[in-house]
């Protein structure tokens, strides 16, 4: 592999460790009181007989001989890549080597699938050094395989036991860490001493709570998207004739859209959670944006930038109801529907077989969106929401609203989707440092035999030296949700809180940004220079923690 000049410099970057975990000879774990989940306590306690109710683990000053015990540790990188994953591995590896030179680290290839296929590599110092502070998950690859069936759990147990592993780290989002909790329970129930620890990863930012201030990768992804949005905003005020509709990743939550809005001050940003809370209709969304387009036209501002979260359509009550009925219809009448080839006939068939209210919603959708709702199905037969061109949908309904009003306004929409661009960028200094500390924390938790925990670090708005590290039981974050027709234990996703400080701040600025040229241009992620340019966390985190 040929290296760019930046790549060479990033390999040399030395993340700062929080002071209180830097000296492993003088640390131990202080356990808090027993814990419980916020909801579904009875169901979860029955499913996790050996790991439910574990205490929170605080890393404190003290002595613990187990820190130097011999560890054979495995890990997986699970789900979509997020910037900083390689530094989690680097922190874990460095901790293991400091604990005992006899320690071993193995990476299973392509996520949990590598555990099931027994496909792994030994991680060496040379291999780690080639990946420090780099983006992506290419060190061992990632995957979305879940360990769900009894046969799969037995296979995982067989392969992990055969490799004589006594520790496993699962780097992933809510689903992956749910799997980590289930594996911790399975191994404990079968008498294994293998310790399972999770690490919070997701660019979507929806794996957070009172214990986890942010998931890694969110910082880098938001800054990457914000650079691109800023570039487009500069183009908008240069050309002065385009309305840019930009979809950003975030199917289940609008954290990325909100953070990007806080960083760039666009003309308008839709927040899915607000749409759901206000029970906004398609017509109301169109009307709100059309009002802005028309008012800006009166000021000679025939341009603008609108940010849209990827999962918007699932938060619009009438469209959500339509999707549910479409899923049921196309599941139960799949054979009958498959014989219809013309879209007009498909549309008529659908409207005849769903409720009157949903039929009205379906008829009012732009044809390209209606077709996507019918044609794009996921492996479970459901509408593939992430494939819907939401940005085109929004600009389409806005254009229709302007036409309906009979007002002649220049309106030339341009569409963008920023997704994969943010997943594998060189991690920001924040993510590089945060991930290294997460990996080091994972080492401490597994060395001190604290299974069923997920790494957590608090005080992230402060300098890294002052961060406080520890572990929180995975089961404390769980609830029961319906998945594929069955109630399953899952870690609850964190949505944007409309009463939270980040949204309230945006809400206070929204009218000002909509009516004027008030764009901000963040520029590219900076790695060298003043701390206020290079090391600042997201505005979301600063607003939440200050």
Swiss-Prot record:
Q: How pH affects activity?
A: Optimum pH is 6.4-7.2.
Concerning SUPFAM superfamilies, the annotation shows: Phosphofructokinase
Cofactor(s) the protein needs: Mg(2+); Mn(2+)
Cystine bridges: none
For this protein, the Enzyme Commission number is 2.7.1.90
Recorded GO CC terms: cytoplasm
The residues that the entry says bind diphosphate are 80
Looking up InterPro entries in the UniProt record yields:
ATP_PFK, PfpB_PPi_PFK, Phosphofructokinase_dom, PKF_sf
**Binding-site positions, substrate:** 202-204, 241-242, 249-251, 310, 420-423
Q: How is its activity regulated?
A: Non-allosteric. Competitively inhibited by PPi, Pi and fructose 1,6-bisphosphate.
Q: Where does the chain bind Mg(2+)?
A: 174
State if Membrane is listed as a keyword.
no
Positions bearing the site annotation: Important for catalytic activity and substrate specificity: 175
Name a biological process GO annotation.
Answer: fructose 6-phosphate metabolic process
Q: Where in the cell is it found?
A: Cytoplasm
Instruction: Name the reaction it catalyses.
Output: beta-D-fructose 6-phosphate + diphosphate = beta-D-fructose 1,6-bisphosphate + phosphate + H(+)
GO MF terms held by the record: 6-phosphofructokinase activity; ATP binding; diphosphate-fructose-6-phosphate 1-phosphotransferase activity; metal ion binding; phosphofructokinase activity
Q: Where is the active site?
A: 204 (proton acceptor)
Main location (coarse class): cytoplasm
Q: Does this entry carry the keyword Methyltransferase?
A: no
User: Where in the chain is the site Important for catalytic activity?
Assistant: 201
Task of the protein: Catalyzes the phosphorylation of D-fructose 6-phosphate, the first committing step of glycolysis. Uses inorganic phosphate (PPi) as phosphoryl donor instead of ATP like common ATP-dependent phosphofructokinases (ATP-PFKs), which renders the reaction reversible, and can thus function both in glycolysis and gluconeogenesis. Consistently, PPi-PFK can replace the enzymes of both the forward (ATP-PFK) and reverse (fructose-bisphosphatase (FBPase)) reactions.
Q: Which family does it belong to?
A: Belongs to the phosphofructokinase type A (PFKA) family. PPi-dependent PFK group II subfamily. Clade 'Long' sub-subfamily.
How does this chain assemble?
A: Homodimer.
| Protein name (record) | Pyrophosphate--fructose 6-phosphate 1-phosphotransferase
């Amino acid at each position: 592999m040929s290296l760019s000049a930046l790549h060479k410099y990033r390999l040399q970057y030395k993340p700062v460790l929080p002071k209180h975990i830097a000296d492993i000879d003088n640390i131990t774990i202080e356990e808090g009181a027993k814990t419980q989940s916020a909801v579904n306590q009875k169901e979860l306690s029955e499913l996790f007989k050996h790991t439910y109710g574990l205490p929170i683990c605080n890393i404190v000053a003290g002595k613990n001989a187990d820190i130097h015990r011999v560890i054979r540790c495995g890990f997986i990188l699970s789900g979509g890549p997020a910037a900083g994953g390689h530094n989690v591995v680097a922190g874990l590896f460095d901790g293991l080597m400091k604990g005992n030179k006899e320690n071993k680290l193995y990476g299973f290839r392509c996520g949990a699938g590598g555990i099931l296929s027994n496909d792994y590599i030994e991680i060496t110092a040379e291999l780690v050094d080639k990946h420090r502070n780099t983006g992506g998950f290419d060190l061992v690859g990632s995957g979305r395989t879940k360990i769900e069936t009894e046969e799969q759990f037995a296979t995982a147990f067989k392969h992990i036991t055969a490799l004589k592993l006594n520790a496993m780290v699962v780097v992933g989002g809510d689903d992956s860490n749910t799997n980590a909790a289930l594996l911790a329970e399975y191994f404990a129930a079968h008498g294994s001493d293998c310790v399972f620890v999770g690490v919070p990863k997701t660019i979507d930012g929806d794996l957070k709570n009172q214990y986890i201030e942010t998931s890694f990768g969110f910082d880098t992804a938001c800054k990457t998207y914000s650079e691109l949005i800023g570039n487009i905003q500069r183009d908008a005020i240069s050309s002065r004739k385009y309305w840019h509709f930009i979809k950003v990743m975030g199917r289940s939550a609008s954290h990325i859209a909100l953070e990007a809005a806080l960083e760039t001050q666009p003309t308008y940003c839709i927040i899915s959670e607000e749409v759901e809370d206000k029970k906004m209709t398609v017509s109301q969304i169109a009307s709100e944006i059309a009002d802005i387009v028309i008012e800006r036209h009166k000021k000679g501002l025939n341009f603008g930038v609108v940010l849209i979260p990827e999962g918007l359509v699932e938060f619009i009550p009438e469209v959500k109801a339509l999707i549910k009925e479409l899923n049921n219809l196309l599941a139960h009448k799949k054979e009958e529907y498959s014989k219809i080839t013309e879209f007009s006939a498909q549309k008529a068939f659908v409207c005849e077989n769903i409720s009157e209210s949903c039929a009205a919603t379906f008829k009012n959708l732009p044809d390209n969106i209606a077709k996507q709702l019918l044609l794009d199905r996921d492996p479970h037969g459901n509408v593939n929401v992430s494939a819907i061109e939401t940005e085109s949908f929004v600009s389409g309904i806005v254009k229709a609203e302007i036409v309906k009003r009979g007002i002649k306004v220049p309106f030339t929409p341009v569409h963008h989707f920023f997704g994969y661009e943010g997943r594998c960028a060189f991690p920001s200094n924040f993510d590089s440092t945060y991930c290294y500390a997460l990996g080091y924390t994972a080492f401490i938790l597994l060395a001190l035999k604290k299974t069923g925990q997920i790494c957590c670090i608090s005080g992230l708005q402060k300098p890294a030296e002052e961060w406080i590290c520890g572990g929180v039981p995975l089961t404390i974050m769980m609830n029961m949700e319906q998945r594929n027709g069955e109630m399953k234990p899952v870690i609850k996703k964190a949505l944007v809180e409309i009463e939270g400080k980040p949204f309230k701040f945006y809400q206070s600025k929204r009218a000002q940004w909509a009516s004027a040229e008030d764009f901000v241009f963040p520029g590219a992620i900076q790695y060298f220079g003043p701390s206020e340019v290079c090391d600042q966390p997201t505005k979301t985190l600063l607003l939440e923690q200050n």
